[in-house]
């Protein structure tokens, strides 16, 4: 358990996990309080922190470059270990962008309150600010259109949280997580995430690892909590811990599944 462990690995998602979702991705910048919390967690030499995000590398480096942690951008397409430059985990194509981004733009023009976020190896149509019913319906239509159009194109179409994402296949948080798990020697592993992209990470964890899904829904995680506030409380408690207590992910954690 936590106090007696010699090497600890934290695999943390960002949006919807450490912070609530914002109306626009750029508005979800971490507060100084959260950065201090991550600094406190990473200050323990036994702790290895990895931020696994769908975000682009520039945003992650701008927001978290000062924290002693490794960064994973675009669900695993790009990795930056502390002290090293960003690296592309495998050769990825962006040829699909010229064909598919116009489809996303059509929907962004057609559905009020929606917009596109283009990243290096992926693109997202966000509908968080749209009329809920109209946005949800359009998301299904867009997904169908993209799947039909991409039958012969090597890309993956994902329905995310109030978003539809197009990305390169064979890249996901499970593969990214294995990069650290394969190093071995971790006797405490904790993974926390909130959506289907995080399920890939939960699926590759060692049997005794702790996994927490934020929010309800079917999950591979061992525990579920209600909100990012619960996650921050948990991590804060770990920073402040004394010794000798048995680790349990939040007194308020529940197993819904």
Predicted regions and their residues:
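Substrate-recognition "cap/lid" segment bordering the active-site pocket of phosphatases
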Residues: 74, 80-98, 158-186
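Active-site phosphate-binding/coordination module
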Residues: 29-119
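Substrate-recognition/cap helix-loop segment adjacent to the acidic, metal-dependent catalytic center
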Residues: 55-74, 134-154
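Hydrophobic "anchor" residues on beta-strands that sit immediately upstream
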Residues: 9-11, 70, 190
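Asp-based phosphoryl-transfer active-site loop
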Residues: 3-23, 51, 177
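Residue-level signal for inorganic ion chemistry
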Residues: 16, 71, 125, 177, ...
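Charged, glycine-interspersed solvent-exposed loop segments at helix/strand-loop junctions
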Residues: 114-133, 154-167
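Mg2+-dependent phosphoryl-transfer enzymes with acidic/Ser/Thr/Gly-rich catalytic loops
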Residues: 5, 31, 169, 174-257
């Amino acid at each position: 358990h936590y106090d007696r462990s010699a090497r600890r690995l934290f695999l943390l998602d960002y949006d919807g996990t450490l912070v609530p979702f914002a109306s626009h991705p750029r508005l979800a910048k971490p507060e100084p309080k959260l950065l201090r919390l991550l600094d406190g967690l990473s200050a323990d030499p036994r702790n290895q922190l990895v931020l696994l995000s769908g975000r682009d590398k520039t945003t992650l480096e701008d927001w978290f470059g000062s924290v002693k942690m490794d960064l994973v951008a675009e669900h695993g397409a790009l990795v930056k270990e502390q002290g090293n430059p960003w690296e592309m985990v495998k050769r990825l194509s962006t040829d699909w962008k010229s064909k598919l981004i116009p489809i996303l733009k059509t929907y962004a023009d057609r559905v009020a309150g929606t917009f596109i976020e283009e990243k290096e190896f992926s693109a997202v149509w966000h509908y968080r600010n749209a009329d809920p019913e109209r946005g949800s319906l359009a998301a299904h239509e867009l997904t169908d259109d993209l799947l039909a159009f991409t039958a012969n194109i090597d890309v993956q179409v994902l329905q995310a949280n109030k978003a539809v994402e197009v990305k390169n296949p064979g890249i996901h948080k499970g593969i990214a997580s294995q990069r650290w798990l394969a190093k071995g020697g971790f006797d405490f592993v904790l993974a926390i995430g909130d959506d289907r992209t995080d399920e890939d990470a939960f699926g590759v964890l060692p049997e005794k690892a702790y996994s927490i899904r934020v929010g309800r829904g079917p999950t591979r995680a061992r525990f579920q909590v209600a909100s990012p506030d619960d996650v921050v409380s948990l991590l804060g408690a770990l920073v402040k811990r004394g010794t000798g207590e048995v680790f349990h992910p939040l007194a308020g954690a529940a197993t819904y599944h």
